[in-house]
Regions:
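N-terminal secretory targeting modules
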Residues: 1-175, 351-354
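Glycine- and acidic-residue-enriched helix-capping/strand-helix junction motifs
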Residues: 95-98, 186-194, 286-290
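Catalytic nucleophile-elbow at a beta strand-turn-alpha helix junction centered on a G-D-S/GDSL motif
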Residues: 173-197
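Short helix-loop-beta junction
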Residues: 197-210, 301
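A short helix->loop->beta-strand "cap" motif at the edges of active sites that frequently abuts
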Residues: 263-268
Length: 355
């Protein structure tokens, strides 16, 4: 087992005082890859998940949530021993069931290793410097953006003589697109890098796009049509959480039909509900969860029997079951442990679909 002293050689907290000489890189910059926000080049420097030109196609609630850059990442390679960030989160808030870092803040990773986080002060401003190593060599850096609040980035900074270049490409460069609810959006991971999608990104070395919309993942055709503008490797439909059982049964076939008109062979995974503790007492929650599980399974089976062999049913109970409820923060939304369970359950299906 490594001692804390040995760990500290590689990573230690940022200095209390800013480093004097810095190489400052205004955002955006061609050497900084913006991932998970595929329409960024249309609307830059805005960090949003849907393009401005499609605004009128979406309900206002969906458009407002699209300003939250969940799944967005800034990636680059550098030999700098320190990384600095200046950003602003003007509308930061604190939900009662979600850590402020996950809701409002940033995570910094070197390769696949977590280094630290940044979060806004009382005025919504962030100025953070991380010391990532004593050793001078090129590394891939990933900065995960907030899951639930809009943000602007003013600049990144490096050692004054450091090199900067675009990040190493993902092994799976075409993004996995996830569409769904607040759970899909990342509620309630403690950190931006702790969402299910971010965990799978690191496991699979795969780019991704998060189109989870808190309370508003209703399977609307406008979202399917927006996805059809992209070039994904796989699509994960995870929107069981928001519609009623009847709404879900009506929306799912329409959503998939739109995708299939564009991509007859695109891998599509459809998840069913994971376990809610309220199910054990029966009642409306148990009935709705059971109905959605049955709808999902029967829909996928019917498609496959009809010749669509590139669609798969993902049993949500493989993503979080009754024995894993410590992974829930409020009986519904996942904490970071819950998202780890989700990722473990979804990973084998993704690996199969992406072969």
């Amino acid at each position: 087992m490594l001692s804390l002293a040995l760990i500290a050689i590689a990573y230690w907290p940022a200095n209390a005082e800013p480093l004097a000489a810095r190489q400052r890189i205004a955002f955006p910059d061609a050497r900084l890859d913006v991932c998970g926000l595929p329409w960024f080049n249309e609307d830059k420097p805005a960090l949003r998940r849907l393009p401005l030109r499609l605004k009128d196609r979406f309900r206002p609630a969906v458009w407002d949530l699209a300003q939250d850059p969940s799944g967005g990442r800034i990636r680059f390679r550098t030999d700098s021993t320190t990384i600095g960030l200046v950003a602003e989160n003007p509308h930061f808030s604190n939900m009662h069931h979600m850590a402020s870092v996950g809701e409002n803040g940033f995570d910094l990773y070197v390769g696949r290793e977590y280094v630290g986080s940044a979060w806004p002060d009382a005025s919504g401003k962030m100025a953070k410097e991380w010391r990532v190593s004593r050793e001078r060599r090129m590394r891939d850096i990933t900065l995960y953006l907030p899951l639930y609040k809009a943000v602007t980035i003013q600049e990144l900074s490096l050692d004054v003589d450091a090199h900067l270049e675009p990040a190493s490409p993902y092994a799976i460069a075409k993004p996995i697109v996830y569409y769904g609810s607040s759970i899909t959006q990342g509620g309630c991971a403690s950190n931006p890098g702790g969402s299910c999608q971010a965990i799978l990104e690191r496991k699979l070395n795969a780019d991704f796009l998060n189109l989870g919309f808190s309370g508003n993942g209703l399977g609307e055709p406008a979202l399917a049509e927006a996805i059809c503008e992209l070039d994904p490797s796989c699509i994960v439909l995870d929107f069981w959480g928001n519609p009623s059982a009847d709404q879900y049964a009506a929306a799912l076939p329409v959503f998939v039909d739109i995708l299939r008109r564009k991509w007859p062979r695109m891998p599509i995974l459809v998840t069913s509900p994971f376990y809610f503790p309220a199910e054990q007492s029966g009642g409306d929650v148990a009935r709705a969860q059971s109905a959605k599980r049955l709808t999902t399974q029967e829909f996928v089976e019917k498609r496959r029997k009809g010749g669509d062999r590139r669609i798969w049913y993902v049993d949500g109970l493989k993503m979080l079951n009754r024995e894993q409820t410590a992974g829930l923060v409020d009986g519904v939304h996942c904490n970071s442990l819950g998202f780890y369970f989700n990722a473990l359950g979804l990973e084998p299906f993704l690996r199969k679909a992406l072969k």
